[in-house]
Amino acid sequence: MTFERGYQIFVRTAYIAGIAIIIVFLPFSKYILSIGMWTITGAWILERVNLKKFTGFYTHGSLFRKILLALPYTLMLWFVSIGKGFRVFFRNKPAMILASLYVLHILGLIFTSDFGYALKDLRTKAPILILPLYFSTSKAFGRNDFYRFMMIFVLNLVIVTLANTWKLFNFEFIDIRDISRHVSHIILGLMISMALFVAGYFLVRKKRTSVWIKLVALVIIVWFLIYLVISRSFTGLGVFIVTLFVLLVIYTFRSRSIWLKAGCVLSMALLLVGGGLYLRSIVRDYYRVETVDYSKLEKVSPLGNPYTHNIQNKQTENGHYLWIYVQWDELREGWSKRSRIPFDSTDLKGQPVQFTLIRYLSSKGYRKDAGGLEKLTDEDIEAIERGIADVVNLNRLSLKGRIYELLMGYEKYLSTGDPTGSSLMQRLEFWRASRGIIAEHWLVGVGTGDMNQVFTEQYRKMKTKLASDQWWRSHNQYFSILIGFGIFGLAWFLISLIYPAYVKRGFEDYFFLTFFIIVMFSLLTEDTLESQAGVSFFYFFYSFFLFGRREHDPL
């Protein structure tokens, strides 16, 4: 093997290794993710170095000359190779337009006053520029290599989800979202949603796939769906269902087979009707309240102590009134025998434990006295200590508890105007703040670095009841772009995402289209591009699917 051939193999191997590192560590570590980015960067530069000039310099001339000029000559070759790469890049119009969003962020410095945050934001957004650059100017992968990368992506997520599930069942988590410590649970949900469609491709679409691979793909699909439920990933489940529905619509119109059309229509009907009936039944259960004859309420407990009945307070938990049949002295005494947390203290979520106890007992239909407390198991006591206030939330394989939480947050907001503690109502408050900012800065936006500042000012102006430690940004990427760069910036953002895919016929490719639907819908409820993991996930797979492979996989 010649030196030149060995060099080429080394550079290509480093490039492949960098891609593999990014795929593996996207859900794990932003630091090692950065190593993957730097590995690709190094390989991209070395690939374009003039090897003859490089070796010629070190094989000719005096030793003194080599030592004196080694560093500047090497740097010169690197800069020349970078220039070669950019010249190729500038001839690739779709890749340039995709990466142009980074230029928009640079231009946003004109209107910013917080340059410290702006520069930090530019570092975070670097993948917007470098990933389209690298993939569009490097040798594309063949179909088999592409499939191997996709298998690595899916199997890696299997490991991540199994590890998270093990942690969930073996450690105490106040917030279930904390099981995903290294990447946002929302970004992880998007990755899993995409992996579901990758596994689905090997199950249904890919030809010459062995029965064993199809069986493994089916098991993985079932497992990912279970994980999305037990991890309460509404975003992951939501974008999966929406993407599946859109694909079914596309297949209905594109297919020439009457049986496939019928199957798609039936599947869509099942999704809509089944999902609607399931949601309707949960909402009806939530608002179904026990019938109580207030004139016949018992006055004392079995131990002879007087009950407190607050019949004016209509609060319920799982259909049972909270403030009837309450005997505080018996609860205080009984709780002190069952728990180390003082009755007047707070649970692990920071809520008054006595009220968590009241809600939990009510959710089981028990009276709030010594008798009701005695019926609780040790597992019930542990749940109350963790801040779980409804027995419905103990069932990890059901979405009922999560939907109850959303409905409770909605009712609390209607009665108090305070969205704190409800993810749904907080998002509505974020969007309300966003609309206020957009109304004032719709033309050119506030710039790259002033987002946090203008949101803080807007929340004060609104006199919001949202807790100040949760005065967050819009949780809607379209709003974020509009606030940062104005209406023309939003238009360019959409062009930068749609035009390259249109020109490269990405919308005719199964992998790109499913990914595109997933991320575009996710942008409605999340600032996906505001974190390193999110922007890396978005632009890595966009660039990889569109520029990084030779053959597309048709729908």
Model-derived regions, located:
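Membrane-interface helix-loop-helix junctions at transmembrane boundaries of multi-pass membrane enzymes
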Residues: T2-R12, R48-M96, F202-L218, Y251-A262, ...
